[in-house]
């Protein structure tokens, strides 16, 4: 069985909103609802979707009252790895076995149900990621420039994901990018997530460092590519305007 976690931390400050970022309207609807609808349509898991949010759970839960949802609270925003670790207590209450965990982001409204369904059927030994490849960073693709880069070895295998703020000038030229969507083997994830370190410029526990852990074990990291529009996230007023135009 596959469980789904949606990370929903983040404020709407950069979009001139007092709302949590995932509730900022996109064509009149909170942006997270587009993703929620895709998750429901994928029919991956009849059990509640787990939303990881900070202390503003109440306002998010009010908007999502018509969905089957459980909440995990991330009291301190210490990174995406820490956010997923916060969901472990909720998952531990399950009576049925869990095989896989899919991690999605509430500010990515364009992910399709078919992609979620495909992701759920992979059954990785460690993890699978969902990259997108750009032709360049021109036009609306410039909004992807600050995303993490997929680093591959000479054999073409994924070795790690490097976040933009930690990337070298050469690594920033890479156009295979990480939207953040990941599918994990449940046991492997929670065995290894506690070993994450925050030795980076942000001093955060990056979920993306799980790729490096898998590679260090000699494990292959799987990939399922998606188109740039499907991968797009919304973090600024400019990106919100682009997303609005893509929906027209």
Regions found by a protein language model. Name each.
Residues 19, 64-67, 227:
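Short, structured coil segments at secondary-structure junctions
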Residues 111-197, 201:
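Conserved core of the sugar-phosphate nucleotidyltransferase
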Residues 1-17:
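N-terminal nucleotide-binding beta1-loop-alpha1 segment
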Residues 18-25:
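Short alpha-helical oligomerization interface
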Residues 22, 68-70, 157, 220-222:
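Conserved beta-strand segments of alpha/beta enzyme cores
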Residues 173-248:
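Conserved alpha/beta core of the MobA/IspD/sugar-nucleotide pyrophosphorylase nucleotidyltransferase superfamily
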Residues 4-6, 50-51, 102-103, 129-130, ...:
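Structural beta-sheet core signal
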Residues 30-106, 110-115:
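Conserved N-terminal catalytic core of the sugar/cofactor nucleotidyltransferase
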């Amino acid at each position: 069985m596959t469980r789904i976690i949606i990370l929903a931390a983040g404020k709407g400050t950069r979009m001139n909103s007092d709302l949590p970022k995932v509730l900022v309207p996109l064509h009149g609807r909170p942006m997270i609802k587009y993703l929620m609808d895709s998750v429901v349509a994928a029919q991956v898991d009849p059990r509640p979707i787990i939303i990881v949010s900070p202390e503003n759970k109440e306002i998010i839960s009010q908007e999502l009252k018509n969905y089957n949802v459980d909440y995990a609270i991330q009291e301190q925003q210490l990174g995406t790895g820490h956010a997923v670790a916060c969901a472990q207590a909720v998952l531990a209450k399950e009576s049925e076995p869990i095989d896989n965990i899919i991690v999605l982001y509430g500010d990515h409204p364009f992910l399709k149900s078919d992609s979620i369904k495909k992701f759920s059927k992979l059954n990785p030994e460690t993890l699978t990621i969902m990259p997108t490849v750009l032709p360049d960073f021109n036009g609306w693709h410039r909004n992807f420039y600050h995303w993490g880069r997929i680093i591959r070895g000479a054999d073409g295998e994924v070795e790690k994901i490097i976040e933009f703020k930690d990337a070298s000038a050469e690594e920033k030229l890479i156009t295979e990018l990480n939207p953040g969507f990941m599918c994990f083997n449940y046991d492997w994830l929670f065995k290894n997530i506690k070993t994450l370190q925050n030795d980076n410029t942000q001093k955060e526990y990056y979920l993306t460092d799980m790729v490096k852990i898998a590679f260090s074990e000699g494990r292959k990291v799987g990939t399922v590519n998606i188109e740039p529009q499907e991968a797009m996230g919304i973090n600024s007023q400019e990106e919100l305007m682009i997303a609005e135009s893509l929906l027209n």
